[in-house]
Every structure is written in structure tokens, then in C-alpha cells.
Amino acid sequence: ENLALIINGRPVYFIPAPDPTKADYTAYGINKALLIDNSGAFRDETALSKHLQGKGVDKVLLTAPGKGIPNIVHGVNQSDVTKSERIISAASCTTNAISPVLKVVNDHFGIERGHLETIHAYTNDQNLVDNMHSKYRRGRAAAMNMVITETGAGKAVDKCIPGLGQKLTSSAIRVPV
């Protein structure tokens, strides 16, 4: 009871599972679940498949670009998913924002080359005070600076619109919020 929010009279459980292979969702009455992984700890098929070893999990959806798994953006390539797929990625927020527009432009006019720029809240990889960092720009105090950095958005677009990624460059500006 202490591990749940009651929403519209139904419990939504917070189930701690440090080792996904040992998680037992059936103990909470959960069977054939779609597990949504936004932990950041698992990013490829091998790691994400650990969730499928837990009791009660049928499919896994990653909320970031994944390696070795289909990266799906609704309105772009959702028809590529088959019912037999058990692990898929919903790509990234940037990929979901730009891919539908790029698909329409590319399909109707073609794209020779382009640049993607995303403005994003600073992340936990940045320092809160000016400090050393392997990527010197990220060493700037996150809450006080706009930091230009790289993003994998161009490569991620290529996973849902094949051939387009080689035509795109991309960068991100991490900003205080």
C-alpha cells in the first residue's frame, strides 16, 4: 500500500527492482506488462532483455534511443513494429519533435543537408558549479550558463528515416531552467 499511488481508485505501484531479472510483478497482480524503462541504466537489447526475465513482463519500451533495437517515432515509422517485437525504443524527445517534420519535407522536396539545433534543460552530466569536466564546456556551472554541446539527434533520426542521418549535423544548447 505504501508503494502505490491511488489514481481514480486504482493502485499504480512503485516497484523497486535493483535487479530486473529478479523482479516479480505478478506479486502485484501485473501480468503481460509493457515495462517502460526510463532509468538510463539500460540502452541496448542485451541489457533491456533483463526486464523480460522478470515475472510478469511481456514487452519493454525504452524512452531513449537504443542500440540494436527498433527506434520508433509515431507518424514516421510506427508501422515497422511487428507484434513479435518485445523490445523497442521510443527514440528521444528531440527525435520525436523533428522526425515527423523532416519526413514530410524529405518525402515531398528532398533534403540535401541540414543542421538540427535543440534547446534542452541542463542534465545531471553537467557540473552545478564551474569545475573540471572531460568536455570543457560541460564544466561550466549548469544553472548559470548556456552550454553548447553535441547531441546524437542526427544519428537518431537516421534510425527512423534511413539515409537522412548522413545529411544532418546536430548540436544542443543546455540551458538553466
Tell what function each PLM region has:
Residues H108, R113-E117, D125-V177:
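C-terminal substrate-binding/catalytic lobe of Rossmann-fold NAD(P)-dependent dehydrogenases
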Residues E1-L128, M132-K135:
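N-terminal Rossmann-like NAD(P) cofactor-binding subdomain of oxidoreductases
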